[in-house]
Amino acid sequence: MLLIDKTVIVTGASRGIGRAAARECARQGARVVIGHSGSDEGRAGALSLAEEIAAFGGTAIAVGADAADLDSGEKLVAAAVEAFGSVDVLVNNAGICPFHSFLDMPRELYLKTVGTNLNGAYFTVQAAARRMKEQGRGGAIIAVSSISALVGGAMQTHYTPTKAGLLSLMQSCAIALGPYGIRCNAVLPGTIATDINKEDLSDLEKRERMTSRVPLGRLGEPDDLAGPIVFLASDMARYVTGASLLVDGGLFVNLQ
């Protein structure tokens, strides 16, 4: 197992990519903090995941911490330290993607998206990094960015800048935190079938068109991200920092 004796915080872990990542981290021996929004749906999803992890002999706790709350990172770190004594890995996954056209973008929607996807992430990364520095044995931070950090989207003008920002944050943090042995990397999912884009993918014609652009011939699934995230969290990636890993079935190179 790759993550034995490590404590891993995963934000947005009640469903989708975060859920798959948290589950696989637990399978690899980690003690997992399942971060969720605090909503009834988020709480239910996180608790069911904690039960699933316990069923195969893993260890996990569920913690409500809305990613839009700039203090959520401190809350997650405090919960991890209280329950498990340390923070070794942060997987910053929480994010929203409400599609909307540019010219009539509501200011509130823009601010909510940036607040959740980028501002919340910044301070969560900071909180985890401070704890890792204090512990004195390094650590790993993985941000779930997106292929949207590299390509535009007419209905995502409020979303793509946040994902580009996450990628840039990991690159800068790799430099800032390298002296403390803290590695910072980003994974860039392509089109992954999750709740966040369920409505967009419900159009079968559009779904088929999107699938046809992927060289591997299918859309991604949350579990497709779990392995790359575990790799970057583990000591197998001990000399990997400031990197960006596309997990898109070849979509980006095909778009080029």
From Swiss-Prot:
Its EC number is 1.1.1.378. NADP(+) binds at G12, S14, R15, I17, S37, D66, A67, N93, Y159, K163, I192. GO terms for molecular function: nucleotide binding; oxidoreductase activity, acting on the CH-OH group of donors, NAD or NADP as acceptor; quinone binding. Keywords: NAD, NADP, Nucleotide-binding, Oxidoreductase, Rhamnose metabolism. Gene3D superfamilies: NAD(P)-binding Rossmann-like Domain. Beta-L-rhamnose binds at S146, S148, Q156, Y159, T191, N197. It is an enzyme of class 1 (oxidoreductase). InterPro entries: NAD(P)-bd_dom_sf (IPR036291), SDR_fam (IPR002347). Changing T191F: Retains 4% of wild-type activity with L-rhamnose as substrate. SMART domains: PKS_KR. It catalyses: L-rhamnofuranose + NAD(+) = L-rhamnono-1,4-lactone + NADH + H(+); L-rhamnofuranose + NADP(+) = L-rhamnono-1,4-lactone + NADPH + H(+). Pathway: Carbohydrate degradation; L-rhamnose degradation. Changing D200A: Retains 16% of wild-type activity with L-rhamnose as substrate. The active site is at S146, Y159, K163. The keyword Phosphoprotein does not apply. NCBIfam families: PRK07231.1. This is L-rhamnose 1-dehydrogenase (NAD(P)(+)). It comes from Azotobacter vinelandii (strain DJ / ATCC BAA-1303). The lineage of its organism: Bacteria, Pseudomonadati, Pseudomonadota, Gammaproteobacteria, Pseudomonadales.
